[in-house]
Amino acid sequence: MTMTDPLGDMLTRIRNGASRRKSSVSTPASKLRARVLDVLQSEGYIRGYSVVDFGNGKSELNIELKYYEGASVIREIGRVSKPGRRVYVSVKSIPQVANGLGITILSTPKGVMADHQAREQNVGGEVLCSVF
């Protein structure tokens, strides 16, 4: 069975794992997923991730979730631009999450980045997800 929204599936696995207080979750690997995880790691929302290669052309990402005083660092994580409804923004209309306390992750011509990096580089793009 094919998956229509692989990034949305990864975000759901992270959300479900955090709500069940799992130390890590796994998801099939892709370049886009790895770039989104790079942003989440640099912003301090996850401890890190590792790539497990099965040798038959398939690989998996093991994501280490982060907790602070017993509570998940990620309170809310959700997909914004979906396969049926893509959301594109200019640099002037990049949304803020929780008045700047959260981040929006964008896919831009300069790569996948957080909202504040996109504003600094003066570039817009597709709004992938929001994290708080």
Swiss-Prot record:
One biological process term in Gene Ontology: translation
InterPro entries for this protein: Ribosomal_uS8, Ribosomal_uS8_CS, Ribosomal_uS8_sf
Keyword Cell inner membrane listed: no
Keywords in alphabetical order: Ribonucleoprotein, Ribosomal protein, RNA-binding, rRNA-binding
Superkingdom in the source lineage: Bacteria
GO terms for cellular component: ribonucleoprotein complex; ribosome
Function in brief: One of the primary rRNA binding proteins, it binds directly to 16S rRNA central domain where it helps coordinate assembly of the platform of the 30S subunit.
Complexes and interactors: Part of the 30S ribosomal subunit. Contacts proteins S5 and S12.
UniProt name for this protein: Small ribosomal subunit protein uS8
